[in-house]
Amino acid sequence: PPLYSSAASDVYKRQIQKGDVTVENLLAQDPDVVVMTLDQKKAAEESGFLADMDSAGLRYAFIDFRQDPLEHTAASMSLLGGLLDKDDRAAKFNDFYSQKVRTVTERVAGIEDRPDTLVWMAAGFNDCCSLAGDANIGKLVTAAGGHNLGPEVLGTDSSQITAEKLVELNPEKLIVTGGEWARDPNKTETYRHVELGYQADEKTAVETCAGPLQIPGIDLLDAPKTGNYYALYHQFYDNPFNVFALEAIAKWLHPEEFADVDPATDFEQFHADWLPYDYSGTFFIDPAHADS
């Protein structure tokens, strides 16, 4: 994407196409270290890929922002800081991150009300309905003072349920994730996903919140009718800036306790302080109160 290619042009030119990652083409890049996600570890071990890397003398490390974001983000950033000779910057980020997390978790510690909540991943883009279980955004719901129903239905990770099951669960709070995805031309029946991201404007984001609700049966849910339906940028699910999703979820679940928190403003300032590209777009939407 232009956002990344302009910020890190040298790295962008050296990308390996999906499916072409072999020890041979990694060696051709002559890396100091290969960084992989924790999601890849088991498959890499079982396939013998790590053994092949060891034999070739390739160094590697694993990071995780997805499986357990609140536990692994700081450790992953410290690891990256060490690898990139940016220990001080990583430590500064972790101080910032930890304070943000504490602001949320300390406030919700005394709140007894834990609203039943579901996170519907890529609603309207993927087939209905993929839920966040006890991982990524599902973990954030729990930390933000919600009762994430996902693990009780799914187990430990995101997976599918039917629209009928979603209606049966009928959560008090419904959060969907949206993004900037191209429509699949092979799908004969596709409902519009929520447009969120760096190129999304608020008006379009609000309008497209209606898309997932057009799936047959979803109109029976109470949350959209009671103003408890929200949309979040999908890429927060696997990113070190997941803490802004935590803020948004806490504000949606407990609006009075987090009336002073403004995730959009905080995220914009984060770009100015930490990122090599400018803030733009829309990342959080509460369609029932978008004009307030």
Residue ranges of model-derived segments:
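Short, structured coil segments at secondary-structure junctions
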Residues: 7, 55-57, 144, 225
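A residue-level marker of the well-folded mature domains of exported/periplasmic proteins
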Residues: 130-131, 138-140, 161-169, 249
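Extracytoplasmic substrate-binding proteins
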Residues: 33, 45-129, 150, 158, ...
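Single conserved hydrophobic/aromatic residue that forms the stacking wall/gate
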Residues: 1-8, 12
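His/Asp/Glu-enriched short active-site or ligand-binding loop at hydrolase and phosphoryl-transfer sites
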Residues: 134-156, 230
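Proline-aspartate-enriched helix->loop->beta-strand connector
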Residues: 13-18, 22-39, 163-180
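Flexible, solvent-exposed loop/hinge segments that line or gate ligand/substrate-binding clefts
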Residues: 169-230, 235
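Alpha-helical scaffolding within the catalytic cores
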Residues: 21, 48, 159-165, 212-219
